């Protein structure tokens, strides 16, 4: 006779209560390590090195995985995974994922109570970071299960990434009654900068987004805010512009100008400003306010007005980032002496990678290879002038020697676009900041000012299609806060006018006779020994000064096409010049390459600057799943564990 139902239920409950806790290793389905229902706990100091930058200082044992001591936590495969995530994912999603994991391994404890991390934070990170795990054939870690170890906002959760986001400080909060278009003209810490950029992108989500191009040596995100009618997508014949600030950590004016510019573009777009709406609907604009956030922290520690001339200039590796790019200018001068040799899109020499390359520098170079930038400006401080390439003298022994590029006329036009509408650059007073440049109209060839190698502007011009100028915003590298509003007023129109010059010259699409786009076709201009190449969609942009130009389009396997182009002096938009290439009967050998350069492996990955496929990346290749069923390459990180190896990371 079966027992009565209440007695049966009681028996089941007793057996379940007596059942020993399981280990995840034995139960991959995940039916173990469930957090205890009670949230009361005894708080202890947080002592995990990998979690030292968490937003709290106290935790408790057992943790949410039932680890009962520091020794058990540090010996666990979960903790080892957090320790090596940065290397495994090449900096992607880190430190975000690491801090998320810390919230499980070392839960937040306050006043004798455990606080759980928010589920929506976990879900948001998983959506963004899942592709990074898929790329290395690794399963999503079980202890980052958003439904098991995380909870809802209405249950009193907290944001484990709040320290990264930078909480809204009292002096950052906007006074009540002010419109959302209000801009606070103050210095921004790293956390405040990130918060403002993300908040701005959220307000203008239909025309803006933020994204990271990498991390600094100390792990800070190199955060970009983009403005476009279709954020995140390159549109056919829509030119790409980038503005970069704070390459030297103690030169902070450019950093603040770009933070203000981001807010201004968003606000004016929402207010219906026709100029800004037209600009964002026809241009894709990328703003990187701080290329050197680590150096900024050093400079900011001394404070505005007290900063030394060089304190914080370099990055955390003590590298000057504007001397850290490949020296392609020396190679250009050599090639310029060789008849028929191409002196544009010069590949990065292999020996460059033997030296110390900053992660910030590498991130910028990879960014350039990813997006077909047309125009760029790097914002500095310490003088009041606009300089343009070349920055390295054609005679290395000469520290000051006029060394023009083949596009000298266009670079002068771009520089004047900034300087001519800047009230202080046009000030005729001899006592003004940067008075030495008055007779030159506040613009100068870089090498004619002072010569140096490894600069970012020369690299842009010689490795890509992008034309970059350098803007010195003022003689004070770290201006006091009260000077920032005036500085913005002086530079706002110059910044807008400069960005608008990307719509000068010609643009178009190169296709074959079937209408298929021709990628990496060369666009040459007679009399200017510097070609540009078409983007993957076959579109191109050629910045040109007013005048009559003979333009040639050519590609391997096609006959060249020549067109005469007239650009009127008052033309404010790029003229459209399309090319249809006809195939050659004799094949690609009729295409004139100049000196063929088959450079060595490019550590940045992807296509080379000449558009040719590079050799396979051995690092990328090893990340593919093994056909023979052996363990993936990352398994070696966990072989030191005698037991409890993380089989839960394996997909097969």
From Swiss-Prot:
Chain residues that bind Zn(2+): 248, 251, 380
Expression (tissue specificity): In placenta, it is present within invasive trophoblasts and in the surrounding extracellular space. Also present in amnion cells, but is not readily apparent in the extracellular matrix of this cell type. Present in normal pituitary gland and neoplastic pituitary gland (especially POMC-, GH- and PRL-producing adenomas) (at protein level). Widely expressed.
One GO term of the biological process aspect: protein processing
UniProt signal peptide: 1-18
Listed cofactors: Zn(2+)
Pfam families linked to this entry: CarboxypepD_reg, Fz, Peptidase_M14
Catalytic residues identified in the record: 472
CDD domains listed in its UniProt record: CRD_Carboxypeptidase_Z, M14_CPZ, Peptidase_M14NE-CP-C_like
Signal keyword on record: yes
Subcellular location: Secreted, Extracellular space, Extracellular matrix
pH dependence: Optimum pH is 7.8.
EC assignment: 3.4.17.-
Principal localisation: secreted
Record's keyword annotation contains Disulfide bond: yes
Domain Peptidase M14: 186-502
PANTHER family documented for this protein: CARBOXYPEPTIDASE Z, PROTEASE M14 CARBOXYPEPTIDASE
Functional summary from the UniProt entry: Cleaves substrates with C-terminal arginine residues. Probably modulates the Wnt signaling pathway, by cleaving some undefined protein. May play a role in cleavage during prohormone processing.
Protein's UniProt name: Carboxypeptidase Z
Organism this protein belongs to: Homo sapiens (Human)
UniProt lineage: Eukaryota, Metazoa, Chordata, Craniata, Vertebrata
Recorded name of the encoding gene: CPZ
């Amino acid at each position: 006779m079966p027992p009565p139902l209440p007695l049966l239920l009681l028996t089941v409950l007793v057996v379940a209560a007596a059942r020993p806790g399981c280990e995840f290793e034995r139960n991959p389905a995940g039916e173990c390590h469930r957090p205890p229902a009670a949230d009361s706990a005894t708080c202890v100091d947080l002592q995990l090195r990998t979690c030292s930058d968490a937003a709290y200082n106290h935790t408790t044992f057992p943790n949410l995985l039932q680890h009962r001591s520091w020794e058990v936590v540090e010996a666990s495969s979960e903790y080892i995974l957090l320790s090596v995530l940065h290397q495994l994912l090449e900096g992607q999603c880190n430190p975000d994922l690491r801090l998320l994991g810390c919230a499980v391994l070392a839960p937040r404890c306050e006043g004798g109570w455990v606080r759980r991390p928010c589920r929506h934070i976990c879900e948001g990170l998983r959506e963004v970071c899942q592709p990074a795990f898929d790329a290395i054939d690794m399963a999503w870690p079980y202890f980052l299960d958003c439904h098991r170890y995380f909870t809802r906002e209405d249950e009193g959760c907290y944001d484990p990434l709040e320290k990264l986001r930078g909480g809204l400080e009292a002096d950052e909060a906007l006074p009540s009654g002010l419109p959302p278009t209000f801009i606070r003209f103050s210095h921004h810490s790293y956390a405040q900068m990130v918060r403002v950029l993300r908040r701005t992108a959220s307000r203008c989500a239909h025309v803006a987004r933020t994204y990271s191009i990498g991390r600094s040596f100390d792990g800070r995100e190199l955060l970009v805010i983009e403005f476009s009618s279709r954020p995140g997508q390159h549109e056919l014949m829509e030119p790409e512009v980038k503005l970069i600030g704070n390459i030297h950590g103690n030169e902070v004016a450019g950093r603040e100008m770009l933070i203000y510019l981001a807010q201004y573009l968003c606000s004016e777009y929402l207010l219906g400003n026709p100029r800004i709406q037209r600009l964002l609907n026809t241009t894709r604009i990328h703003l990187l306010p701080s290329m050197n956030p680590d150096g900024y922290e050093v400079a900011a520690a001394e404070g505005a007005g007290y900063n030394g001339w060089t304190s914080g200039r370099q990055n955390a590796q003590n590298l000057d980032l504007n001397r850290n790019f490949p020296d392609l200018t020396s190679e250009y001068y050599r090639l310029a002496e060789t008849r028929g040799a191409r002196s544009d899109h010069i590949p990065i020499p292999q020996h460059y990678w033997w030296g110390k390359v900053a992660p910030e520098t590498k991130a910028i170079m990879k960014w350039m290879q990813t997006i077909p930038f047309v125009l760029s400006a790097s914002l500095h401080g310490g003088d009041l002038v606009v300089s343009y390439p070349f920055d390295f003298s054609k005679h290395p022994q000469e520290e000051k020697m006029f060394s023009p590029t083949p596009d000298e006329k266009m670079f002068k036009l771009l520089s004047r676009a900034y300087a001519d509408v800047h009230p202080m650059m046009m000030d005729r007073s001899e006592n003004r900041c940067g008075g030495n440049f008055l007779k030159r109209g506040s613009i100068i060839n870089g090498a004619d000012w002072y010569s140096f190698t490894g600069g970012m502007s020369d690299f842009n011009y010689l490795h890509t299609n992008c034309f970059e100028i350098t803007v010195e915003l003022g003689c004070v590298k770290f201006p006091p806060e009260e000077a920032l509003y005036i500085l913005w007023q002086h530079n706002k129109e110059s910044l807008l006018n400069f960005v608008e010059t990307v719509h000068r010259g010609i643009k178009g699409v190169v296709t074959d006779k079937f209408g298929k786009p021709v990628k990496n076709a060369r666009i040459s201009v007679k009399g200017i020994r510097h070609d540009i190449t078409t983007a993957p969609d076959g579109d191109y942009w050629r910045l040109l000064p007013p005048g009559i130009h003979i333009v040639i389009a050519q590609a391997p396997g096609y006959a060249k096409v020549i067109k005469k182009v007239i650009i009127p002096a008052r033309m404010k938009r790029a003229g459209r010049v399309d090319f249809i290439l006809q195939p050659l009967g004799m094949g690609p050998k009729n295409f004139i390459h100049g000196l063929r350069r088959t450079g060595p492996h490019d550590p940045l990955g992807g296509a080379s600057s000449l558009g040719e496929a590079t050799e396979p990346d051995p690092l990328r290749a090893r990340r593919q799943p093994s056909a023979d069923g052996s363990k993936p390459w990352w398994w070696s990180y966990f072989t030191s564990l005698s037991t409890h190896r993380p089989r839960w990371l394996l997909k097969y």
